[in-house]
């Protein structure tokens, strides 16, 4: 697997930190008790996501093992680790994530809620609570010198509570590394998304267009606020490796799926 290495400079760090970053693994699995129909669905989706010749589960295992062998401080899992919500898939996801001791920083994507009705329901959150620090909508992990923040934007319907909690994290003043699934619209990302997904690709694959909810547009404005202590934003969803500025000096990094044979590694060093 190819590694893209990025060095991030942050003020006030007393040591070097290393994080890996992947997303969109699309694990699908059926437990025997779920029956033949569930098994057929899992097999079909696994085959669909193996278009590179690499099984999603094998690629995810390799990504986790690389982070483990490197002694990384963690691995960012920016959504769609699960292809859809089912008992079998959740069992496979848990077994996968528990296979190494490296801390996992996981946020929901659109596929983690696949099949949930109504579309804006948060009723699926309990299935992921133990994997997302008890709070899939918003979690924060404090490293002392900086903090990691994960938010669910997988349905493009940001909630008032999420933005309030993000504002509280801003007020703490520490540099933040922000994990989401759907990248926000920037000048840098529009053309790569159009090239991969067509002229209308940004409508589906990016957050921040005029037809998105006011809360979602407000969220994007918060990420572009020059006063916000955001050091960098990390995302997935577009199945494309990308790095581009949100505003000068603030990068948005998007991972390609592990099954496409690329993983990103970040080295955080003192400025």
Task: Mark where each language-model region is.
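The substrate-binding groove and active-site-proximal loops of carbohydrate-active enzymes
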Residues: 47-53, 81-83, 152-156, 205-210
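N-terminal active-site segment of His-dependent metallophosphoesterases
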Residues: 1-87
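Extended active-site neighborhood of metal-dependent phosphoesterases/phosphodiesterases
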Residues: 2-11, 86-175, 199-205, 219-222, ...
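Short, solvent-exposed loop/turn and secondary-structure capping segments
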Residues: 31-32, 117-118, 189-191
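Residue-level marker for buried hydrophobic side chains located in beta-strands
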Residues: 19-21, 77, 106, 178, ...
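Active-site glycine-centered loops adjacent to acidic/histidine catalytic or metal-binding residues
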Residues: 24, 79-80, 109-110, 181, ...
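His/acidic metal-ligating clusters that form di-metal
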Residues: 55, 60-74, 147, 156-246
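Feature marks short, surface-exposed loop/turn motifs that line or immediately flank catalytic pockets
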Residues: 26-29, 112-114, 184-186
